């Protein structure tokens, strides 16, 4: 079988038919409208200053510290998300490039505005871990234990109020119904 010569017209048509790659998110701090109150900004400045290691107290942190400051202020961004808003710096620049408070504030506003709310599926998936029999039920006692000991811990009375009337005769809870109950307010 003889080899075919490549047809430039066909190759060009194939290339044109390829879907356009969506542009990657680029963060522009100047485009972010700051919506924090003056008192909040002062609190943020205070937290930011605790990470400032400059000898003169110049209100600067390294790029590597940005995620730590965000987490100290109650956010939970991944390292990838932090690197993305910092413009994907090279690893060797993380400990040398500096970020001042005026540049950090729009980054903080971005994470505050875009704080992810968990979806129904996220919560159900998280509770499915405790569904040992795969029947859509979790032990009420185990769920109580998790709610008072892990993450943002709840008090016993908060848990009782939350779970009131949801346990069946065997002490089990349908976790999909539980999530619907919570998300409905």
Swiss-Prot record:
GO terms for cellular component: A band; myosin II complex. GO terms for molecular function: actin monomer binding; calcium ion binding. Signal peptide: none annotated. One of its GO terms (biological process) is cardiac muscle contraction. Keywords: Motor protein, Muscle protein, Myosin, Repeat. Residues 1-20 are annotated as: Disordered. InterPro entries: CALM/Myosin/TropC-like, EF-hand-dom_pair, EF_hand_dom. Residues 39-76, 118-153, 153-185 form the EF-hand domain. The keyword Zinc-finger does not apply. Light chain 23 is expressed in chicken embryonic skeletal, cardiac, smooth muscles and in brain continuously from embryo to adult. Myosin is a hexamer of 2 heavy chains and 4 light chains. This is Myosin light chain, embryonic. It comes from Gallus gallus (Chicken). The lineage of its organism: Eukaryota, Metazoa, Chordata, Craniata, Vertebrata.
